[in-house]
């Protein structure tokens, strides 16, 4: 393949830290130690960043997967970042009680392509069409001081360990990049695109792994696969893990 064509087809999967910053609290420093996951971004399109967070209310509880989960989803309009430390206002501007859904992770991305950030919250609950406790990828918009559901899907194609939002194909729309469990307990990387009503499986990796996780030390989509650091590339409609 010629070098010029290769450059057009090869895309490193990456986040956009200028627009969005998301962290687990173990990876950062934040003034409220009850917060277990947070993102900063302009969720109401007013030209200024907000911080949206999952707060555990000081209870320090964990899911069967050993992941911490919270009770409240909070939005702060006032916060400062000083030498890497995030200092929040004394009280959130908005607080939503999701204690019956056990939220564990919040992310931001424009999944439906309307130019506005959507809010992704991982919940742990039963749903109508899947009567078992499992992690669910719920999506919301923030409008008029409320979290308005965009998509409360029952599940992805398979149970997932974790997922991130990123634009893998440079179409200015965020895709779901998911680490999923197969029937034989191996893991694969799967990508989903918004179809107007929900998410369709777009592509998945051919390679399978016994253990697969995101490298939390970088903003790019990099993996730890069976103990080795691996890069993810999107080439000519395929995912390669190198």
Task: Enumerate the language-model features and the residues they cover.
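Beta-propeller-forming repeat regions
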Residues: 22-242
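Short, Lys/Arg-enriched N-terminal segments with co-localized hydrophobic residues
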Residues: 1-4
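Sec-dependent signal peptide recognition
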Residues: 6-13
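Hydrophobic h-region of N-terminal signal peptides that target proteins for export
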Residues: 14-21
């Amino acid at each position: 393949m010629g070098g010029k064509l290769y450059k057009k087809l090869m895309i490193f999967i990456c986040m956009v830290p200028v627009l969005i910053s998301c962290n687990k609290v173990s990876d950062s420093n934040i003034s409220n130690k009850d917060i277990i996951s947070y993102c900063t971004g302009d969720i109401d399109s007013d030209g200024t960043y907000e911080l949206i967070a999952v707060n555990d209310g000081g209870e320090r509880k964990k899911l069967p997967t050993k992941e911490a989960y919270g009770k409240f989803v909070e939005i702060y309009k006032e916060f400062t970042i000083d030498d890497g430390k995030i200092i929040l206002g004394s009280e959130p501007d908005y607080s939503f009680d999701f204690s019956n859904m056990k939220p564990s992770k919040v992310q931001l991305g424009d999944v439906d392509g309307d130019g506005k950030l959507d809010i992704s919250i991982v919940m742990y609950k039963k749903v109508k069409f899947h009567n078992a406790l499992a992690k669910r990828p719920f999506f919301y918009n923030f409008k008029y001081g409320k979290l308005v559901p965009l998509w409360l899907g029952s599940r992805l194609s398979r149970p997932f360990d974790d997922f991130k939002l990123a634009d893998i194909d440079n179409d200015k729309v965020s895709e779901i990049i998911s680490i999923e469990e197969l029937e034989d307990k191996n893991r694969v990387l799967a990508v989903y695109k918004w179809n107007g009503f929900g998410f369709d499986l777009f592509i998945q990796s051919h390679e399978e792994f016994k253990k697969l996780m995101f490298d939390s030390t970088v903003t790019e989509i990099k993996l730890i696969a069976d103990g080795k650091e691996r890069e993810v590339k999107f080439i000519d409609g395929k995912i390669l893990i190198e």
